[in-house]
Amino acid sequence: MGEPRAGAALDDGSGWTGSEEGSEEGTGGSEGAGGDGGPDAEGVWSPDIEQSFQEALAIYPPCGRRKIILSDEGKMYGRNELIARYIKLRTGKTRTRKQVSSHIQVLARRKSREIQSKLKDQVSKDKAFQTMATMSSAQLISAPSLQAKLGPTGPQASELFQFWSGGSGPPWNVPDVKPFSQTPFTLSLTPPSTDLPGYEPPQALSPLPPPTPSPPAWQARGLGTARLQLVEFSAFVEPPDAVDSYQRHLFVHISQHCPSPGAPPLESVDVRQIYDKFPEKKGGLRELYDRGPPHAFFLVKFWADLNWGPSGEEAGAGGSISSGGFYGVSSQYESLEHMTLTCSSKVCSFGKQVVEKVETERAQLEDGRFVYRLLRSPMCEYLVNFLHKLRQLPERYMMNSVLENFTILQVVTNRDTQELLLCTAYVFEVSTSERGAQHHIYRLVRD
């Protein structure tokens, strides 16, 4: 257990220390427009603007008519407004949301023509046309969205989606095929059998050096580094009469037990965009990133599944822990190094720390690697009450408005050397999928 941080008020008995400075909750925001000023070279999309536009498309997935509240401004933004805002921040040049919308439509029409020209047979063309007719322009220019809609339609499917990924990144799920064997070999020449005067037989050629070992397949495609990898993370509730973990309800969940070597590399997000969502004081995200190492910083966007158990009214007074059930968090890490890990989890509201929990875990050697398990760590009462109050809100957009100002910062260090091994920033929305909790992992960078 770590020492209580500045402003700590009490320890609730589960290892969480609290602070009053960040306990405010609420929603906010009025309708806002992104970039309505006079455009810079209106209608011209220079390379820097196009680059920022493509980056914004990756950061902000299609969200229909739903809007997002940015805590630093308290305004609600649609996707096109966020893209226009991103372009302004990155390039200093203004593009209105209407210009962004027009540009998306132009690209969608172009992509539609190109995709149909790539398909060889009429059946595939007809199916693609029918599917694309049901999609918005925003979905049409998103390769993953289109692939999910169309699915593999024939022998041309692989080529099709490599083409659709365009120049914004590497093709999706393309294996790294080497043109030559990587196996080292030895080439030697047998000297001729001759007694010619002055003849010196040639020396055997030295073997070629072995190839440099490749980094693990997950390293650029999952949450982890060469020194420490996250294997699993979950926040859950178990009913009082649960007999095994299958009866859990998972609010959020990450599983990296079997990382796919064919998965695309992680997308990047500028860490400066989320500085204000975390404490500015000692131990905040800005200071941690300044110290580095930069490759150990990640952002996880969770779409949390809040569809569980009884309603808030049935859960008991304030939805507290005494209302029944066990609320917990489990995580597992792996490493090739023998260490003792310290894991700090800070819950933040409006960019200020509310509570913090510090845990320590020793290594267990399993199958030639060191495993670190922090299992069934009790969730603090603040979080349990927060979940129940959040669930009582009548509309999903209200829940998302509250979650816009709610974040968690998790820092894993080597206890003995104080080296930072992993730093993960978590942000949240409410899941709309019947498949439950979902997530997306990004790498935090600073250009």
Curated annotation (Swiss-Prot):
Compositional bias segments (type: Low complexity): 11-20, 183-206
GO biological process terms held by the UniProt record: cellular response to retinoic acid; embryonic heart tube morphogenesis; embryonic organ development; hippo signaling; lateral mesoderm development; neural tube closure; notochord development; paraxial mesoderm development
Keyword Nucleus attributed: yes
Entry keywords, A to Z: Activator, DNA-binding, Nucleus, Transcription, Transcription regulation
Key word DNA-binding present: yes
Region (Transcriptional activation), start-end ranges: 172-447
Molecular function as annotated in GO: disordered domain specific binding; DNA-binding transcription factor activity; DNA-binding transcription factor activity, RNA polymerase II-specific; RNA polymerase II cis-regulatory region sequence-specific DNA binding; sequence-specific double-stranded DNA binding; transcription coactivator binding
Location of this chain's protein in the cell: Nucleus
Main subcellular location of this protein, as a coarse class: nucleus
Xref: SMART domains: TEA
DNA-binding region: 38-114
Residue ranges, compositional bias (Gly residues): 25-40
Region (Disordered): 1-46, 183-218
Comp. bias intervals (Pro residues): 207-216
Domain of life: Eukaryota
Gene3D superfamilies, A to Z: 2.70.50.80, TEA/ATTS domain (6.10.20.40)
Gene Ontology CC annotation, any one: nucleus
Subunit composition and interactions: Interacts with YAP1 and WWTR1/TAZ.
Role description: Transcription factor which plays a key role in the Hippo signaling pathway, a pathway involved in organ size control and tumor suppression by restricting proliferation and promoting apoptosis. The core of this pathway is composed of a kinase cascade wherein MST1/MST2, in complex with its regulatory protein SAV1, phosphorylates and activates LATS1/2 in complex with its regulatory protein MOB1, which in turn phosphorylates and inactivates YAP1 oncoprotein and WWTR1/TAZ.
UniProt-recorded name of the protein: Transcriptional enhancer factor TEF-4
Lineage: Eukaryota, Metazoa, Chordata, Craniata, Vertebrata
